[in-house]
């Protein structure tokens, strides 16, 4: 009774914790990282045979033992033979002898010698492959794991824009002993643009959640396979990753016909090795992994059993280096994010017969940045009602053009408004679709436009004729980015024209017609 009462008294004398202290203790417990544990697994004999079968060595060993069995059978077995001798006046003679006495024993011996040479070559290849493995002791492995845990990840993307070029070459072929030259057509890949980027996760926060690796010293040898991966703690950080990734590939998507996308994760300032064999003591390895044991077993054609035994005595573990993103996520302001302009890729127009025909038959010259800067500033009074007309261009006729043809004009994204306040006058005979870059929305819209003849809205209009041979430029030339991605396209017409009338496009639209 007294023994049971003493603890009760001790409990009664212990002061109760205040609510503030309990909350602090709970917070401290929460802050402590509780990591999961991972241990190497020793596999069974059948599992080790399935993991590393060494089927080449096994097949060669079986064939060599079959040849040895055939030679042994020739030496041990005795059969009854019947022979005729002419010196004995045609009498037959019965005797016992080896079934391979007539030279048949050399057939399995020849096969055995050939297979033995191939077997030794395979053993040398396996030994060289084993020597190339990364070997380390347990302390070095733990240090390497600690460095990978503390390393900062780099989640990268890489995009390669390319197209195929049709080429020809002369090839010499032979037929019935005669040499002749033919022309071979082949397609060669040409890389035109390579871009790289990485995920900006400074607003997400990062934490390593890899498991604790224990009990490596309990096994004489352990094969470790390392894998890098990352995960997200919340939906916001995942959306940030997907948004940056989509923006990067969208920027590169339309630069050429095809795009090769790559992505991955690297650990900065860490020499990452995927496969490592860890020993308790690197200087004193087990006897069965020594060079002498391997080659002695190979000479006696016992290399395959030794390999299975080594695999059986080796433990395996697949260790993941995992980084968790989004623990300290803070929403980034819209102004800090870079502005991406989504352009229509080349392959997106393949389903449109009209746009495809227009792309193949256009006659356009894109001025360079230097040419755009050196253009004269003329007639600034054209732009009334809009202070900054933007980077504009006019259709300049080549030495006379009499009939309307298909043309397109892609202007600056600042030219969505009409400078004169009136409707734009287009020089197209029949306008079906307009693919416009909306100012301020960074989106591409596709809608139907009105269809009319050239006589209704043609260059006979006085306002249109008054704009002839005019080039409206703002005082400040465009930036290099605008000049590159939003050029002024000047359409040159091939056929003659009696009147030198010009039509000014005042919208950043691409007009097409059949």
From Swiss-Prot:
Subcellular locations according to the entry: Membrane
First-listed, main subcellular location of the protein, grouped into a coarse class: membrane
Keyword Transmembrane: yes
Membrane topology, from the record: Multi-pass membrane protein
Keyword Transmembrane part of the UniProt annotation: yes
Transmembrane stretches, start-end: 57-77, 104-124, 286-306
Keywords: Membrane, Transmembrane, Transmembrane helix
GO cellular component: membrane
Region named Disordered: 1-40
Family: Belongs to the TMEM151 family.
The protein, known as: Transmembrane protein 151B
């Amino acid at each position: 009774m007294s023994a049971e009462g003493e603890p009760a008294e001790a409990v009664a004398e212990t002061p109760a914790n205040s609510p503030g202290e309990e909350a602090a203790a709970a917070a401290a417990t929460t802050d402590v990282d509780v990591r999961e544990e991972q241990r190497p697994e020793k596999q069974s004999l059948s599992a080790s045979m399935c993991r590393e079968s060494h089927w080449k060595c096994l097949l060669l060993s079986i064939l060599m033992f079959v040849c040895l069995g055939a030679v042994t059978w020739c030496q041990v077995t005795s059969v009854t033979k019947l022979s005729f001798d002419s010196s004995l006046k045609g009498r037959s003679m019965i005797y016992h002898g080896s079934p391979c006495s007539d030279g048949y024993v050399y057939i399995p011996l020849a096969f055995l010698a050939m297979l033995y040479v191939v077997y030794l070559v395979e053993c040398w290849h396996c030994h060289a492959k084993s020597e190339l493995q990364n070997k380390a002791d347990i302390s070095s492995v733990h240090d390497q794991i600690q460095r990978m845990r503390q390393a900062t990840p780099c989640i990268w993307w890489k995009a390669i824009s390319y197209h195929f070029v049709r080429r020809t070459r002369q090839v010499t072929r032979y037929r019935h002993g005669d040499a002749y030259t033919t022309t071979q057509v082949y397609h060669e890949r040409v890389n035109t643009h390579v871009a790289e980027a990485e995920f900006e996760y400074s607003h997400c926060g990062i934490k390593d959640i890899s498991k604790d690796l224990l009990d490596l010293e309990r096994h004489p040898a352990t094969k470790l396979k390392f894998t890098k991966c990352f995960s997200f703690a919340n939906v916001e950080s995942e959306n940030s990753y997907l948004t940056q990734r989509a923006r990067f590939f969208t920027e590169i998507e339309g630069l050429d016909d095809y795009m090769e996308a790559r992505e991955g994760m690297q650990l900065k300032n860490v020499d990452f090795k995927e496969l490592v064999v860890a020993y308790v003591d690197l200087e004193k390895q087990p006897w069965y992994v020594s060079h002498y044991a391997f080659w002695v077993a190979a000479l006696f054609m016992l290399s395959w059993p030794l390999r299975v035994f080594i695999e059986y005595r080796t433990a395996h573990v697949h260790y993941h280096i995992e980084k968790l993103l989004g623990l300290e996520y803070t929403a980034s302001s819209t102004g800090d994010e870079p502005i991406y302009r989504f352009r229509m890729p080349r392959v997106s127009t393949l389903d449109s017969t009209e746009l495809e025909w227009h792309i193949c038959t256009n006659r356009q010259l894109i001025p360079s940045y230097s040419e755009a800067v050196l253009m004269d500033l003329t007639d600034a009074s054209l732009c009334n009602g809009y202070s900054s007309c933007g980077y504009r261009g006019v259709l300049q006729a080549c030495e006379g053009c009499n009939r309307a043809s298909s043309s397109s004009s892609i202007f600056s994204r600042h030219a969505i408004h009409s400078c004169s306040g009136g409707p734009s006058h287009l020089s197209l005979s029949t306008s079906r679709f307009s693919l416009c870059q909306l100012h301020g929305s960074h989106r591409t819209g596709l809608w139907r436009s009105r269809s009319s003849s050239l006589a209704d809205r043609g260059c006979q209009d006085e306002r249109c004729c008054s704009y002839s041979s005019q080039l409206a430029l703002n005082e400040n030339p465009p930036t290099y980015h605008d000049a590159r991605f939003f050029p002024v396209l000047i359409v040159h017409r091939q056929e003659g024209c009696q009147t030198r009338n010009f039509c000014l496009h005042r919208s950043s639209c691409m007009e097409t017609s059949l």
